[in-house]
Amino acid sequence: MKFVKQISLLALGLCMALSLHAQPKREFRGSWLTTVWAIDWPNPHSQADAAGQLKQQQYMLSLIKLHEKANLNAIFFQVRGFADAMYKSKYEPWSQYLTGTRGGEPTYDPLQLVIDSAHARGIEVHVW
């Protein structure tokens, strides 16, 4: 009986040790930043001039800070909405939501802004 008890305790201890080892090292907490129809960003009513684009950048920074405050560690940033791009592409034109004109080049690179700002806060960026 004593031997069975010892084996049972050993098996229980081994199971506990293995389950602790199997736990993920961190949680994956993220949210989507949707650009199609300017649902989350950029503001479709912002002006297309340099001042309007500066407001777009400031608003994106506020969204990233909001992610940081909510203790999220990942952002899924939509970079393709309507066969256009939120980054410099040799295949697709710039999104009309950035400048008001499809293919109009903005004064900044939105994808690079998101990557730099999020990484500075320890937030991963995944594009879709």
Enumerate the predicted regions with their spans:
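Bacterial N-terminal signal peptides that target proteins for export
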Residues: 1-8
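Bacterial N-terminal signal peptides
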Residues: 8-19
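Structural motif
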Residues: 22-23, 67
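Boundary/entry segment of secreted carbohydrate-active catalytic domains
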Residues: 23-48
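Soluble non-cytosolic domains of exported or imported proteins
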Residues: 50-58, 105-109
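Aromatic-lined substrate-binding rim segments of carbohydrate-active enzymes
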Residues: 77-128
